[in-house]
């Protein structure tokens, strides 16, 4: 990557970080760790 500009490298790094955080969020929302999450709307008495 010696011929590419610093701006392109920075843009790729930011893109990879954002995709990683998005993947982590989806994994935490729907993966095995989601079994322990509670829905406060289900526990609320009307």
From Swiss-Prot:
Primary location: membrane
Q: Where in the cell is it found?
A: Cellular thylakoid membrane
Q: Which GO terms describe its biological process?
A: photosynthesis
The membrane topology noted for this protein in its Swiss-Prot or TrEMBL record is: Single-pass membrane protein
Q: For this UniProt entry, what's an example GO CC term?
A: plasma membrane-derived thylakoid membrane
User: Which keywords belong to this entry?
Assistant: Membrane, Thylakoid, Transmembrane, Transmembrane helix
| Pfam families (alphabetical) | PsbN (PF02468)
Q: What does this protein do?
A: May play a role in photosystem I and II biogenesis.
Q: Which family does it belong to?
A: Belongs to the PsbN family.
State what protein this is by name.
Answer: Protein PsbN
Q: Which organism encodes this protein?
A: Prochlorococcus marinus (strain MIT 9211)
Q: Give the gene symbol.
A: psbN
């Amino acid at each position: 990557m010696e011929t590419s500009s610093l701006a392109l490298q920075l843009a790729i790094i930011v893109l990879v970080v954002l995709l990683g955080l998005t993947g982590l969020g989806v994994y935490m929302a729907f993966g095995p760790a989601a079994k322990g999450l509670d829905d406060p709307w289900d526990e609320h008495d009307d």
